[in-house]
């Protein structure tokens, strides 16, 4: 499980966008714009796990038979270009590496021992279709944290559900942030 802790094998495959960056023949060259085609491809790959199939079906439907101008394809291209304006391939590569190798249990007696040290009240939110932080992983995190509450958001938008389903999220967050003491 990842849960901000470590990655399961299937998640490592989904998140390994570094391969796309490394496949760009300019990556490794000593200039800031090197690896940009790979960066755009990495973003497109990442989007598939952020949004998920249901979210794409709802937001990117198209009657057009021309694959190259299909809404889903042009959306992927646009998002790749947008990321290239904000990052360079080297910084994104380093961020991906940090995400993929983070393990809160490292040198802390393992994941469970590290999480048991947390004394704060925690809120864990799962999203029904999230492929990055799955519901079983979020439920496992909830069980490992000594003082946590679990809620679930139902959304067809995968990991992006936390951005799209703001009304559901607000109903969960507001009582946690502003508790009423009776």
List each model region and its residues.
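Catalytic active-site module of serine/aspartate enzymes centered on a nucleophile-bearing elbow/loop
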Residues: 139-140, 147-182
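Active-site nucleophile elbow and catalytic-triad environment of alpha/beta-hydrolase enzymes
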Residues: 78-79, 94-114
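Single conserved hydrophobic/aromatic residue that forms the stacking wall/gate
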Residues: 1-9, 13
């Amino acid at each position: 499980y990842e849960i901000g802790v470590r990655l399961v094998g299937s998640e490592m495959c989904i998140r390994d966008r570094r391969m796309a960056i490394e496949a760009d023949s300019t990556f490794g060259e000593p200039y800031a714009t090197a690896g940009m085609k790979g960066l755009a491809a990495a973003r497109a790959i990442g989007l598939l796990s952020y949004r998920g199939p249901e979210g794409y079906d709802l937001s990117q439907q198209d009657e057009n038979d021309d694959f190259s101008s299909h809404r889903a394809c042009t959306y992927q291209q646009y998002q790749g270009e947008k990321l290239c304006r904000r990052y360079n391939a080297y910084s994104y590569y380093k961020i991906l590496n940090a995400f993929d190798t983070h393990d809160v249990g490292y040198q802390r007696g393992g994941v469970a021992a590290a999480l048991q040290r947390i004394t704060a009240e925690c809120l864990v939110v799962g999203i029904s279709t999230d492929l990055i932080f799955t519901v079983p992983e979020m439920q496992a995190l909830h069980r490992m944290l000594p003082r946590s509450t679990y809620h679930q958001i139902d959304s067809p938008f995968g990991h992006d559900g936390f951005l799209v389903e703001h009304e559901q999220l607000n109903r969960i967050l507001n009582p946690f942030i502003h508790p009423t003491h009776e």
